[in-house]
Amino acid sequence: MAKTSMKPDPADTVAEALNPELESDAKVAESRRGVLIALPSWVYLTVFFALPLVIVVVYSFATRSSTGLTRLTGWNLDSYRRLFDPLVAQIAVRSLVLALATTVICLLLSYPFAYYIATRAPKWRNLLIVFVLIPFWSNFLVRTYAWRVILGSDGPLAQLTESLGFEPIRLLFTNTAILIGLVYGYLPFMVLPLYAALERMDWSLVEAARDLYANGWTAFRKVTWPLSRPGVIAGSILVFIPSLGAYVTPALLGGARTTLLGDYIVSQFLAARNQPFGSALSVAVMSVMLVAVIIYFRSGAKNL
């Protein structure tokens, strides 16, 4: 049976030629439909993101009375001047060091694993990706509490070292415990972008490099690493940003001995009732995160 092709009606073609307004009206109608479809999302982002952000910025310029009340009159920069206090600088440096250490360790652990996944057969890739996503099947708070038990003074790690004749290892409420918790919590955020970059890579370029007598290290340094760099940058941003403002993990695994930016900001809002200073701290942290996001978009990692 011969195939019949659908041809436009000549009458419609003539009508469109004689009435150019029809095409314009169609575009306007389509644009209006797009606006209506996106309206709930815009309302949600405005109410739960943009409006709270504006409130935080406004409160950062407010004044705090002697009774702990926040006054929106007489705006000043006192809260921002306090950001340069030695205590705040110490907490900020500690938070930055832990966030950078978390990012570097996640990268060192994730790259070989992502490389291994990307070089497997498709059926094994899916299974290995499921293993990466398994931690997300349970609550983050529950998983962090599990590390609290493991690293505790009576936990399995301490009992194991004691049974081997060594001093029991007590890592709970230390920077090491926080680092372990952060690496465990954010490791998948590094694996997935790296896998996406490596999986989309043209592996024939690696084969060509080997054919030109490049050893494994040279092929990796000249071909694999540059092509996977967008995934490295994307994963680093996805790990660094939440690590810098982490609150749950430092609170549960670090305790009162270690104060990071997330804990300090919460204490200013709740315990100290100093909302202007807490808002200024939040704006400062968001500014650092904004710089990281700008680096992310300018790096070309957005193409992942």
Task: Label the model's feature ranges.
Residues 50-88, 150, 154-155, 255-256, ...:
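Short membrane-interfacial helix/loop motifs at transmembrane-helix boundaries
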Residues 67-72, 149, 247-275:
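Glycine-rich helix-loop "coupling/hinge" segments at transmembrane-helix boundaries
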Residues 39-51, 130, 134, 184, ...:
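Transmembrane alpha-helices
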Residues 8-16, 20-56, 126:
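N-terminal signal-anchor/first transmembrane alpha helix
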Residues 2-20, 25, 195-206, 210, ...:
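C-terminal transmembrane helix and the adjacent membrane-cytosol boundary/short C-terminal tail
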